[in-house]
């Protein structure tokens, strides 16, 4: 069993914020793989299903971002999981928009949701870092992450990324994190088709 956690802030006001892309990823997985209807549990919203034969719990903490660890810790203890069974989806300022990187352990890099989870279960959980880009100046970060994705961003990469994450999610259930990241990358950056080589014909002289 694994616990997939999407980070964000609860409520319609925040639903389309850049900071909520973790919630969007979680919702995409639930939709794509026909998980159970969401219900309130563990200070969050929970859906259950299977991915590649593995039981999976999807959790969206409703504690607000800064207290996300309370929900994650409660769910992890209930299911008797280890941090290695926990995969967290969250927004990453230090990655270009649409880039996805996998990581296990490490620091929080200023992300309050990650800091809270590490405080409750330790740092050795698996992380899906979803790039949202940086506004360029530190004093603009708060307004940027709590701002909505533009229509152009949504059409250009957000929708494609959420679909790609949902499509590749079974790889996370079986521990193939690097393959997951590569599959998502290729969905957003398809390799150009190689044209078959044609033999040059000798021209008339």
Curated annotation (Swiss-Prot):
It is found in: Cytoplasm. CDD domains: PTH. One of its GO terms (biological process) is rescue of stalled ribosome. Its EC number is 3.1.1.29. The record marks 9 as: Discriminates between blocked and unblocked aminoacyl-tRNA. PROSITE patterns: PEPT_TRNA_HYDROL_1 (PS01195), PEPT_TRNA_HYDROL_2 (PS01196). It catalyses: an N-acyl-L-alpha-aminoacyl-tRNA + H2O = an N-acyl-L-amino acid + a tRNA + H(+). The active site is at 19 (proton acceptor). It is an enzyme of class 3 (hydrolase). Coiled coil: none annotated. TRNA binds at residues 14, 64, 66, 112. The keyword Transcription regulation does not apply. Disulfide bonds: none annotated. Keywords: Cytoplasm, Hydrolase, RNA-binding, tRNA-binding. It comes from the Bacteria. The record marks 91 as: Stabilizes the basic form of H active site to accept a proton. Hydrolyzes ribosome-free peptidyl-tRNAs (with 1 or more amino acids incorporated), which drop off the ribosome during protein synthesis, or as a result of ribosome stalling. Belongs to the PTH family. Monomer. This is Peptidyl-tRNA hydrolase. It comes from Parvibaculum lavamentivorans (strain DS-1 / DSM 13023 / NCIMB 13966).
């Amino acid at each position: 069993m694994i616990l997939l956690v999407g980070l964000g802030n609860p409520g319609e006001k925040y639903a389309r914020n850049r900071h909520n892309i973790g919630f969007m990823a979680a919702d995409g997985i639930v939709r794509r793989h026909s998980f159970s209807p969401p219900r309130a549990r563990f200070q969050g919203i929970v859906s259950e299903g299977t991915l590649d034969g593995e039981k999976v719990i999807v959790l969206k903490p409703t504690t607000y971002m800064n207290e996300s660890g309370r929900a994650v810790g409660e769910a992890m203890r209930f299911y008797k999981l280890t941090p290695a069974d926990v995969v967290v989806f969250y927004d990453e300022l230090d990655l270009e928009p649409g880039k996805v990187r996998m990581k296990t352990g490490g620091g929080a890099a200023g992300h309050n949701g990650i800091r809270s989870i590490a405080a409750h279960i330790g740092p050795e959980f698996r992380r899906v870092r979803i790039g949202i880009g940086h506004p360029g100046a530190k004093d603009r970060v708060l307004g940027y992450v709590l701002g909505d994705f533009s229509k152009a961003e949504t059409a250009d990469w957000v929708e494609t990324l959420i679909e790609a994450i949902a499509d590749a999610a079974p790889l996370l259930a079986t521990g193939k994190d690097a393959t997951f990241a590569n599959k998502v990358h290729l969905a957003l950056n398809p390799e150009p088709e190689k044209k078959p080589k044609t033999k040059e014909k000798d021209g008339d002289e």
